[in-house]
A protein has these predicted regions:
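A beta-strand signature from Gram-negative outer-membrane beta-barrel systems
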Residues: 1-30
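N-terminal plug
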Residues: 2-9, 39-43, 469
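Short, glycine-/polar-rich solvent-exposed loops and beta-turns at beta-strand/coil boundaries
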Residues: 7-11, 45, 411-415
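Transmembrane beta-barrel wall of Gram-negative outer-membrane proteins
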Residues: 11, 93-176, 329
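Residues embedded in well-ordered regular secondary structure
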Residues: 21-133, 307, 324
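Conserved small-residue
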Residues: 30-83, 181-182, 436, 527, ...
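Acidic, glycine-rich flexible loop segments
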Residues: 67-89, 104, 185-216
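Extracellular/periplasmic, surface-exposed regions of secreted and cell-surface proteins
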Residues: 103, 154-163, 168-173, 179, ...
Length: 594
C-alpha cells in the first residue's frame, strides 16, 4: 500500500529520507575530515608509434593496398630521430596524472532542551580529477573539479505541551568545472588518436594536428580549448505543525505541513580556438626528410564567453492530515485522512505540473500477531482532460507475525518470523504533458506571398490528432514475502516475490491506423508490460569483544515481458517485440561467409 499513498505519482516507487533531529541534553559537536587519493588501478597499454605503423601497413596489405610507411619511415619511428615529423606520443600519460585528490569535511552541531532542539550540519566536498591542469593560460582552469557545499538545519519547537512545530532548511551549492570539450568525451580522443599521428606541439609552438584528425589533439583540447563552469543552487524549506487532540479523544492528532523547493542553475562557457599544423613529412629511399608543412585554423586570444541560465524549478507542497492511533486491549487501530497538493513549475512554456490527492488509510492489528492495512487514494493530475482528471488507487496488505504465536514460544532461536502479502493499484503521470487530449495545430501549411516585397506567409496546418480517453499509466502490483530474525537478531533474512502489470502506457497510435487517413495519429493508452521477480537478502551481524563485524548477501531476479506496444505489422514473427523482454536488443547474428 505504500505506493498507493502517492496515487498518480507512486507507480515508479518512492524514496523516503528521514534526516537527523536535535538532542535535548546539551550540545554535541562532530567533526569529520576525509582525504582520499584516487589512483589508476590499471591503465590501458597503447601501441607505440613503431608498432602502430607496422600494424597499419599489415592491414593495408591485407586489403591489397600499398603500404603507408616505407622502411626508412618505420626506422624513424623506431629510433625517434625525427620526433616532430615521426612522433611517438603517449596521449594517456600526457593528459592524465597518476592520482586525483578528494576532500570531504563534515561538521554537525546538535543540542537543545525539552522546549527547543536543533541540528545543523555543514558538508563540504571537493574532487579533483586525474586529468592534468592547464598551466599555460591563467585566464581559465580546465581541470575537471566537482565542488559541493551543503548546509542543513532542522528545528523542533515545543510550543505547548500538545503542539509541536518543526522546521527545516537546506542550502546546497554545486560547481562543476572542466574543459569545454567535455571531461568524458576527451577520452574518445585519447583512445582514438594514434601515437604516430602528430606531436603535441611543433618546434614553432603550434599544436599538432592533421587533415584526418583535425583539431583532435587531446592535449590542446584539454588545455587550450576553453572551459565550462556549471553552478547549481538549491534551497529547500519545510514547516510543519502537529497538534495533539487527545482532549477530544485519546490518540487523535492533526498536522499541517508546507514545503518549498527552489532549484536554479547557470552554465558558463569560455570559448578559445587554436592553430594546428602538420609537417606532412616523408623520407625518400636515400634517407632524405621532406616536409610540406600545412597550418590550419586561427588562434583566438580574446576569449568568447557565454553565460546562459540553464534551468529553474520551483516545487511547492501542502499537506493536511488528521490521524488516529489507539489500543483497546489486544486491538490496535489506526487511521488517517490526508489531503495533499503539489505544484512543480519549470522554466519554459507549458512546463508546470500539478497534482492533488485525498486519501484514507486504515490499519488494524490484533494481539501483535495479525495486521491489516488498507488505503484508498483519490488522485488527480492537471495533465488529464477536464472531467477525467481523477482516478482511484486502492491497496490492501496483510501480515502474520508467526513468531508471536504461542506454539513458537519454545522455538527460542527465532526472534521474528513474519509472513506478509499486499496488492494495490498506483499510477504514473510523469510521461504525460499538457493538452495531449487536444487537437494540435502548427504553421507549416501551404503559404502565399503578399505585400510590396511579396514576402512569404505560411499557412496553418493540423498537427497530431488528440489522445482519445487519455488516462495516467496504471500499475497493478502484488507482493508476497517473509522476514526472519534469529539468534538474538544476529541473523536476518528477507525474501519477497512480486508481480506487476503496467497498463495504459502511451504508445504510438499510427501503427494501428491506416496511412490513408492523411494526418499524424497521436498516441494511445494501449501499452502493456509485465514484471515478475524475486528479491532476497541474508546477513549476519555479531561482535567479538569490542570488534563488530557483519557479512551479508543479496540476490535479485527480474523477468519482464512486452504484452503490447501497438507494434505495426511485421513480415516475420521474430520481428515482433511482443512476448520478449522490455528493452531487449535486436540484431542479426554473424554466422560467417558462405
Amino acid at each position: 500500500p505504500a505506493a498507493a499513498l502517492y496515487g498518480m505519482r507512486g507507480a515508479n516507487g518512492v524514496v523516503l529520507i528521514t534526516t537527523k533531529r536535535g538532542i535535548s541534553n546539551g550540545l554535541k559537536v562532530n567533526v569529520d575530515y576525509n582525504f582520499g587519493v584516487n589512483t589508476q588501478f590499471r591503465s590501458p597499454d597503447f601501441a607505440d608509434a613503431y608498432t602502430y605503423a607496422n600494424a597499419l601497413n599489415t592491414a593495408l596489405s591485407g586489403d591489397g593496398l600499398p603500404a603507408r610507411y616505407n622502411a626508412q619511415e618505420l626506422d624513424a619511428f623506431r629510433t625517434g630521430i625525427y620526433p616532430y615529423d615521426y612522433p611517438n606520443v603517449d596521449w594517456w600519460n600526457e593528459t592524465l596524472n597518476n592520482t586525483g585528490l578528494t576532500h570531504n569535511l563534515k561538521m554537525s552541531f546538535s543540542g537543545g532542551s525539552d522546549k527547543f532542539r536543533f541540528y545543523t550540519v555543514v558538508d563540504y566536498y571537493r574532487d579533483r580529477s586525474m586529468l592534468k591542469k592547464n598551466t599555460e593560460d591563467t585566464r581559465f582552469d580546465t581541470t575537471p573539479t566537482d565542488t559541493r557545499l551543503t548546509v542543513r538545519t532542522n528545528l523542533d519547537v515545543k510550543v505547548t505541551e500538545s503542539t509541536l512545530l518543526k522546521a527545516g532548511i537546506v542550502g546546497r551549492l554545486k560547481e562543476l568545472r572542466g574543459t569545454r570539450y567535455g571531461r568524458n568525451t576527451i577520452f574518445n580522443k585519447i583512445y582514438g588518436i594514434p601515437s604516430a599521428a602528430f606531436p603535441i606541439r611543433y618546434e614553432n609552438g603550434i599544436y599538432g594536428g592533421s587533415s584526418v584528425y583535425g583539431t583532435g589533439n587531446p592535449v590542446a583540447l584539454l588545455k587550450d580549448y576553453g572551459h565550462i563552469r556549471n553552478v547549481y543552487g538549491t534551497l529547500l524549506a519545510d514547516l510543519s505543525i502537529r497538534q495533539d487532540l487527545s482532549a477530544l479523544t485519546k490518540g487523535l492528532a492533526a498536522e499541517a505541513s508546507v514545503s518549498f523547493d527552489n532549484i536554479g542553475g547557470m552554465n558558463e562557457t569560455t570559448n578559445k580556438e587554436y592553430r594546428y599544423m602538420n609537417s606532412n613529412a616523408s623520407i625518400t629511399s636515400d634517407g632524405t626528410l621532406v616536409t610540406t608543412p600545412a597550418i590550419y585554423g586561427t588562434d583566438s586570444e580574446t576569449l568568447g564567453h557565454t553565460q546562459p541560465f540553464e534551468r529553474l524549478m520551483l516545487r511547492s507542497d501542502f499537506q493536511a492530515k488528521v490521524d488516529y492511533n489507539r489500543t483497546f486491549g489486544k486491538h490496535q487501530v489506526g487511521g488517517a485522512l490526508i489531503y495533499d497538493m503539489q505544484s512543480v513549475v519549470k522554466n519554459g512554456r507549458n512546463n508546470s505540473q500539478k497534482n492533488q490527492s485525498v486519501l484514507v488509510n486504515a490499519t488494524y492489528t490484533y494481539d501483535n500477531r495479525y495486521s491489516l492495512n488498507a488505503v484508498f487514494n483519490r488522485s488527480g493530475s492537471a495533465y488529464l482532460p477536464d472531467g477525467d482528471k481523477y482516478s482511484n488507487y486502492p491497496a490492501v496488505s496483510a501480515a502474520w507475525i508467526v513468531s508471536n504465536e504461542a506454539f513458537m514460544e519454545k522455538v527460542t532461536p527465532i526472534n521474528l518470523f513474519k509472513i506478509r502479502a499486499s496488492y494495490g493499484l498506483s499510477g504514473w503521470d510523469g510521461n504525460l504533458s499538457h493538452e495531449l487530449w487536444r487537437q494540435s495545430y502548427g504553421s507549416g501549411g501551404a503559404g502565399y506571398n503578399f505585400g510590396v516585397n511579396a514576402g512569404g506567409q505560411s499557412g496553418g496546418s493540423e498537427g497530431d490528432l488528440p489522445v482519445i480517453g487519455l488516462v495516467a499509466e496504471k500499475s497493478q502490483k502484488a507482493t508476497f514475502g517473509f522476514d526472519l530474525a534469529a539468534f538474538d537478531n544476529r541473523l536476518n533474512a528477507t525474501v519477497e516475490g512480486f508481480y506487476e502489470k503496467r497498463s495504459d502506457i502511451l504508445v504510438s497510435g499510427a501503427n494501428s491506423t491506416s496511412g490513408i487517413i492523411g494526418i499524424t495519429v497521436g498516441q494511445v493508452n494501449e501499452g502493456i508490460y509485465k514484471y515478475k521477480g524475486l528479491d532476497a537478502s541474508l546477513s549476519w551481524n555479531d561482535k567479538i569483544g569490542d570488534f563488530h563485524y557483519g557479512i551479508g548477501a543479496s540476490m535479485s531476479y527480474l523477468n519482464t515481458e512486452v504484452v503490447n506496444v501497438n507494434q505495426a505489422y511485421q513480415e516475420y514473427d521474430y520481428l515482433y517485440t511482443k512476448g520478449n523482454r522490455i528493452g531487449q536488443m535486436y540484431g542479426l547474428e554473424a554466422i560467417g561467409f558462405f
